[in-house]
């Protein structure tokens, strides 16, 4: 346990137990908008949020409770899975769930106790080193055809059935399905993704004896796939990360008493939502289509998770201009959400992805919470620096859900 985290882990258990005991039902609506990778850092003096022309977000921030949240702990850079779990009130260290399980669930594969899932990227390998970890973000249709071709040629390795599932752009998932339930630790295998260009792929390495069999099969899988795609111009190699088994995690509705809908175009985020029992139908299109889907289903649910991916993608590409523009595009259609008049509207990110760093970072994430029961008036705009002035301060991400429930008047008094 990280020093100082033991108390925090116990506090998360305590929080969920207490919240469960004081839940009360009403007709209020809670909308959580996640601009993936929202937080940034200054380039030429201003961050992406500070540079963006976002009159609607700025107006909302002036009348909202604002602050900054830390998904894992100070100084710890979170992945997307931990970041989202924390937003939903699950401690990211207690519930360590591999990216593979999330990706596979999001792509419609129901995981069994016999399965190991892994998230895969098509990549460009040149002279033994990774030139591009995302194969130039190859188009989704080309990626789909490549993945379907792999499935036709690779159906089984040793005693494991191999299931390929095409994803978005360079992404896909692989599930190894064994004939019998696996013991704990069977998926404890190091990622082969070096996380940076200019480095060789990481050797497949089991981290415990229970993972040795699967690691050998993964080595054979990589060799077989590479032989098939080696003549592709960009997607001539694969990188694997997030080896995982199906986890057993409490359902969102059981904890919070909320019937919930996830609206996300990227499979991993639908997978995460499904994992905790949210309805997560496939949604296609852009942000406008996501908001249209929200409107169409608004009367059917209590809680809505709306995920917007491209903010993070541009941050990872180091594209400050386009990350800023994507935030502006969201601001332009934000009135469509405001028109629904949810009792609680939260807008934030799952982590920071500064264009300056071209990747996720440890920096606290700006958040605004709009409801009838906040002070407001402390921030002049929505940005990292302005949110430091807000009434929420800097706080653990797992506290967002209790705050949402309280502002929706869904929590009774605790104690006499």
Tell me the role of every PLM-derived stretch.
Residues 8-416:
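Feature captures the catalytic ectodomains and active-site-proximal regions of enzymes
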């Amino acid at each position: 346990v990280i020093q100082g985290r033991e108390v925090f882990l116990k506090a998360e258990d305590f929080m969920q137990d207490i919240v469960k005991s004081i839940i009360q039902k009403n007709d209020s609506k809670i909308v959580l908008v996640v601009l993936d990778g929202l937080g940034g850092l200054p380039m030429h003096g201003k961050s992406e949020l500070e540079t963006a022309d976002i009159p609607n977000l700025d107006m909302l921030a002036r009348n909202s409770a604002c602050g900054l949240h830390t998904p894992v702990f100070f100084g710890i850079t979170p992945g997307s899975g931990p970041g989202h779990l924390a937003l939903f009130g699950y401690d990211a260290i207690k519930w360590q769930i591999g990216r593979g399980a999330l990706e596979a669930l999001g792509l419609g594969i129901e995981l069994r106790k016999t399965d190991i899932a892994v998230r895969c990227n098509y990549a460009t390998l040149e002279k033994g080193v990774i030139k591009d970890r995302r194969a130039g973000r190859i188009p989704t249709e080309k990626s789909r055809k490549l993945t379907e071709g792999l499935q036709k040629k690779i159906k089984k390795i040793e005693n494991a059935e191999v299931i390929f599932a095409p994803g978005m752009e360079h992404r896909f998932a692989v599930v190894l399905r064994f004939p019998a339930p696996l013991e704990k630790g069977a998926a404890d295998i190091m990622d082969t993704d070096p996380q940076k260009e200019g480095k060789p792929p990481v050797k497949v390495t089991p981290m415990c004896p229970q993972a040795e069999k699967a690691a050998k099969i993964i080595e054979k899988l990589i060799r077989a796939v590479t032989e098939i795609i080696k003549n592709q111009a960009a997607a001539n190699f694969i990188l694997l990360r997030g080896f995982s088994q199906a986890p057993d995690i409490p359902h969102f509705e059981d904890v919070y008493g909320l019937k919930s809908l996830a609206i996300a175009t990227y499979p991993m985020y639908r997978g995460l939502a499904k994992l905790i029992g949210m309805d997560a139908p496939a949604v296609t299109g852009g942000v406008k289509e996501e908001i249209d889907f929200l409107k169409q289903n608004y009367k059917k649910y209590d809680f809505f998770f709306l995920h917007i991916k491209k903010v993070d993608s541009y941050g990872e590409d180091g594209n400050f201009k386009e990350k800023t523009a994507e935030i502006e595009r969201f601001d332009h259609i934000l009135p469509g959400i405001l028109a629904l008049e949810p009792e609680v509207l939260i807008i934030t990110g799952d982590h920071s992805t500064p264009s300056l760093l071209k990747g996720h970072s440890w920096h606290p994430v700006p958040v605004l919470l709009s409801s009838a029961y906040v002070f407001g008036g402390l921030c002049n705009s929505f940005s990292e620096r302005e949110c430091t002035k807000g009434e929420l301060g800097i706080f653990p991400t797992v506290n967002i859900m209790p705050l949402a429930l309280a502002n929706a008047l869904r929590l009774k008094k605790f104690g006499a």
